[in-house]
């Protein structure tokens, strides 16, 4: 291997600080967990010197896809994971709770306020030094000044320096949390570090619409199932009941069969941004572009993100043929994103096709959907259950670059990597029980898998119950109760360790 393992005393690095590369969700959570335990952190973030194609502001923990952290219910896998993280004093979940916007039983945030608050909190930590420089592989022809203020290329042009990953690894413990948009320069050094070229995939972001441009004569407010007219419910009683749904969580856009089929036809024929063949093969199912999903069949969307189950159209008193949902995107309640409408359509086509949806004829799109490149390593071959690199114990990975998929999952991986980076000083490890969601995820990414793919939190990765339960809700409740019980025991052990 090009990088040699740093000699340690008692299994721990001799440096007095831990370096974290990447100021996203995983990196910020890791910084907090390490700093609160009295160890200094150097947090490297390349913004504002350099931005990825999807990022646009200088704050840490910037959210570029959906503003939803998914369900808060314990009977939902991601809801369970959030509850575990709350027990573990997750800074980012606490902040998300503080800046939450209405989203029914889900946790959705005002993305701007979330990033601002996380940035303020990290900046206020005495043990954290934020270094606004890119980490990666410097060119052989670059001359770096002694104070790391500039680099000069062969033509004499000065620019911001690139901090060497190799040097950081040689000096001490490093957590690489650079996310799905890891720079090309750093990707090259990661290849040298791991000896593995990793994998690439794409996910997509949905458009955001100005609320005032939505035709509320067609659209209606309400949550799935609670808005629906009961089987024996009188029409007038139902209308009176749903009248109280005003300004309640989701805006729903009903479609009849003719409207849906026309929309589907135009969507499947719309122009998209061209991808390379290898990119097309690597689209992650959990964030599949709606136009790709639509091409799988005319009814695919009606059984997916546009399913009408649980709704009644106030205009007809009947279930719609299909329903498009819009979710509040900011605390002011003036912006709404299109649920499940991650897309790679050209901007002009998005305006044309999505305006065919009843209620969006005059929609003002404040942000169009875009595709993002995502990079993740072959974690089952490279990492153990603590997100520690098997070939170099002073290197940890965290976040979506490890193959965990989702905001909450990324935060969880950052927390685990941080705890174990701290424990490296005492030659010990923190492994969460596989019965917990946080433990099951870390076990998944470390388990050999020839067809390794990104994974969200889900009950399928937990050990099954001894008793067989057919009722899905009851089964998930028991799995969640068991996880919280195991987490309680783990908390006692953590108190002894720290």
Which sequence ranges carry the predicted segments?
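Intrinsic disorder/low-complexity segments
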Residues: 1-13, 140-170
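Beta1/beta-strand and adjacent pyrophosphate-binding region of the FAD-binding site
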Residues: 15-26
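N-terminal FAD cofactor-binding segment of flavoenzymes
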Residues: 32-94, 435-438, 442
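A conserved beta-strand/loop capping segment in the N-terminal third of enzymes
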Residues: 56, 72-119, 123, 127
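Predominantly flavin-linked oxidoreductase catalytic cores and closely associated redox partners
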Residues: 127-146, 161-326, 336-347, 351-352
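Glycine- and aromatic-enriched mobile tails/lids
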Residues: 137, 401, 420-498
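A glycine-rich dinucleotide-binding beta-alpha-beta segment and adjacent secondary-structure elements
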Residues: 337-404, 411-413, 429-446, 452-458, ...
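An active-site-proximal "capping" alpha-helix that borders the catalytic cofactor pocket
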Residues: 409-424
């Amino acid at each position: 291997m090009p990088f040699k393992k740093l000699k340690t005393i008692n299994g721990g690095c001799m440096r007095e600080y831990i370096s974290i590369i990447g100021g996203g969700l995983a990196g910020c959570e890791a910084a907090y967990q390490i700093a609160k335990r009295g160890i200094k952190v150097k947090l490297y973030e390349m913004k504002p010197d350099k931005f990825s194609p999807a990022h646009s502001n200088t704050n840490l923990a910037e959210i570029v896809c959906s503003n939803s952290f998914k369900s808060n219910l314990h009977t939902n896998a991601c809801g369970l994971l959030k509850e575990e993280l709350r027990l573990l004093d997750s800074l980012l979940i606490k902040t998300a709770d503080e800046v939450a916007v209405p989203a029914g039983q889900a946790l959705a945030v005002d993305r701007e306020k979330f990033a601002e608050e996380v940035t303020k909190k990290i900046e206020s930590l005495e043990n954290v030094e934020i270094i606004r420089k890119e980490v990666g592989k410097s060119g052989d022809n670059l001359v770096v000044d002694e104070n790391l203020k500039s680099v000069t290329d062969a033509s004499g042009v000065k620019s911001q320096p690139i901090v060497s990953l190799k040097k950081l690894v040689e000096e001490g413990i490093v957590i690489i949390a650079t996310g799905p948009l890891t720079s090309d320069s750093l990707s090259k050094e990661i290849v040298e570090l791991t000896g593995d070229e990793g994998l690439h995939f794409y996910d997509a972001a949905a458009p955001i619409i100005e609320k005032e441009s939505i035709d509320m004569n067609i659209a209606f407010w309400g949550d799935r199932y609670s808005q629906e007219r009961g089987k024996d419910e009188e029409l007038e009683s139902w209308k009176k009941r749903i009248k109280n749904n005003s300004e309640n969580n989701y805006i729903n856009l009903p479609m009849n069969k003719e409207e849906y089929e026309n929309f589907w036809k135009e969507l499947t024929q719309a122009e998209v941004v061209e991808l390379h063949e290898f990119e097309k093969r690597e689209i992650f199912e959990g964030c599949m572009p709606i136009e790709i999903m639509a091409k799988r069949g005319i009814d695919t969307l009606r059984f997916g993100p546009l399913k009408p189950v649980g709704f009644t159209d106030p205009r007809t008193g009947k279930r719609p043929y299909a329903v498009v949902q819009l979710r509040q995107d900011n605390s002011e309640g003036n912006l709404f994103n299109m649920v499940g409408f991650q897309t790679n359509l050209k901007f002009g086509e998005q305006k044309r096709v999505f305006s065919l949806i009843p209620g969006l004829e005059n929609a003002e799109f404040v942000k169009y959907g875009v595709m993002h490149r995502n990079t993740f390593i072959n974690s089952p071959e490279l990492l153990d259950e603590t997100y520690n690199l098997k070939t170099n114990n002073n290197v940890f990975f965290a976040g979506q670059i490890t193959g965990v998929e989702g905001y909450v999952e990324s935060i969880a991986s950052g927390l685990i990597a941080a705890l174990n980076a701290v424990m490296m000083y005492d030659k010990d490890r923190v492994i969460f029980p596989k019965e917990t969601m946080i433990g099951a995820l870390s076990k998944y990414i470390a388990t050999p898998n020839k067809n390794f793919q990104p994974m969200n939190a889900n009950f399928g990765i937990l050990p099954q119950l001894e008793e067989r339960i057919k009722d899905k809700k009851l089964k998930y409740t028991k799995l969640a109760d068991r996880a919280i019980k195991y987490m309680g025991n783990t908390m006692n052990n953590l108190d002894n360790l720290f």
